[in-house]
Amino acid sequence: MKKILLIGGTSLIGQHVIETAKSKIDCPPRDIIDLKNFSTIADYDYNGYDCLIFVAGAGMRHGRDITFEKMDKEYIKDTIDVNCSGATFLLQKYLHHNPKSVVVVIGSGAVYKTSTPNVVYTASKVYLDRMIDILENTYQDTFFIRVNPSKVNSRFEHVDWYIDPKAVAKGVWHCIENNIKKLDISYPKDK
């Protein structure tokens, strides 16, 4: 990889992807690419990238666990705007300029759950995961990689069995270096 575009570099996983990178990484701040602002997505120059690593997301900040009934309209809109609408438009723009590249999407182990209190977050991650299925058939020269970690340690105290963001970053690079299309990372079954 010569030039990588990272979306979500301020997340814990994104920070560890940057720390462990062996290639040049461009990580535009939110004022340059804001997934809730289509004009910033449209205005970015996507030319010349070998790889997109998409780790941005909304709706599960630091273990947020809210029921469907308690979700307010701002939470719902923010989660869908970032995880679905913004992600879709960004992928459209990126793939238009780089149809023969690598696209890594760090999603969520929640895509496998059929029972969860966080309906909106989980549904948005299922949308993103399914969209990658469809894009793989459309962009056959693009190598798509999905990394779906279960609960990631996101500044929780006294929770040693959540997945370390460093391990997820290591998994991302392992998939890229070894042409692995999918990696599910989960915590021990007895937890």
Please give the residue ranges for each predicted region:
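Rossmann-fold scaffold of SDR-type NAD(P)-dependent oxidoreductases
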Residues: I7, Y49-G59, N83, V105
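N-terminal Rossmann NAD(P)H-binding glycine-rich loop of SDR-like oxidoreductase domains
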Residues: I7-E19
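Conserved mid-core segment of classical short-chain dehydrogenase/reductases
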Residues: G57-K77, P117
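Catalytic Tyr-X3-Lys loop
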Residues: E69-F89, L128
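Hydrophobic positions on the long internal alpha-helix
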Residues: G86-Y94, M131-I132, C175
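Catalytic loop of short-chain dehydrogenase/reductase
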Residues: V102-Y127, I132-D133, N137, K151
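Flexible, glycine-rich beta-alpha linker
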Residues: Y112-T116, N137-I163
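C-terminal helical subdomain
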Residues: R146-V147, H158-K191
